Amino acid sequence: MKLSPLKIDNLKASLPIIQGGMGVGISLSKLAGAVASCGGIGTISAAHPGYLEPDFETNPLEANIRALKHHVKEALKKAKDGLVAVNVMVASNDYEELVKASVESGANLIISGAGLPMSLPELCKGTATKIAPIVSSSKVCSLILKMWDKRHGATADAVVFEGPDAGGHLGFKLEDIDKSREGFYDEIGKIIESIKPYEEKYNKEIPLIVAGGIYSGKDIAKVLKLGAKGVQMGTRFVATNECDASEEFKMAYVNSTKEDIGLVKSPVGLPGRGIRNTFAKRIEVSNDPIRKCYNCIGKCPKKDIPYCISCSLIDSVKGETENSLVFCGSNAYKIDKIVPVKSLIEELVSEVEKE
């Protein structure tokens, strides 16, 4: 099977592979720029990109906005003619500011989930930045596109369907994960059908990008044959030389086993997937003291949470991978080495071409 370019409105990536946004600090300009320069779409996570800034503890919003703008511009430089996206979580208290900063910096695309991105069309109106909601089902996709059409007279430039095998927070209720996994491939066709009325109304193609558990070229080929136009992959890109995380974080993936990976407790009210390390097991039975609040998530029940997710993710990206939260996709245990981004992409393309 030969890979076709991924077209998102008037943008074109030579490869239909989006590197997923991973925070805190896992996918910044180094990784996103490398992926974009190889023909994919590199994605910067807007979740605390300024965690290394000197004023982050005292002025987290200013530090994050400054760092986000820096990383978008740096990634675009590295990308040459490639495309750079930013992943912004709707759940963030600073959602509007982060989207605007991404647009001002020249991001080609905003990918937005962890909630319904109802205001995204208005925030990007009149700019060259394209918009793509993350959805967990055809029902959610229909709801978002219907509301965008009704409220903003606009539609998506692409749609990302993220299945239950993804890493990080999942857009599913805990009791629905197994059922959603069983219906994952059938849901692709349903989402494509839910997009069609808006393609016709707005006279444009709205490509579906499939994410969640996509590991190999075989996986890529399977979803493309079902009608998807591209894939989004996060976990594979962690184990690359260019990934912005610490070597200790990358090696946590390399050293993981299938039994190590499972659902982990999160204070944001959604199930998450990661490595069930000492930390993950501990917080199931006791709470970690909250040493700092960054006021990052709107619905965070601060008095009742088992731990601060920002603090834990910052600890893990810096290398404390046994006593902090390490998110990963369901197939992370298959990774056995760290490779250059270019080599990984060449491997994936070669595998697809054999299908």
Language-model segments: residues:
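Active-site entrance/lid segments in N-terminal catalytic domains of soluble metabolic enzymes
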Residues: M1-K201
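Conserved active-site-proximal phosphate/metal-binding subdomains
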Residues: I18, A166-I209, Y215-E355
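Residue-level detector of alpha-helix initiation sites
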Residues: I26, I214-Y215
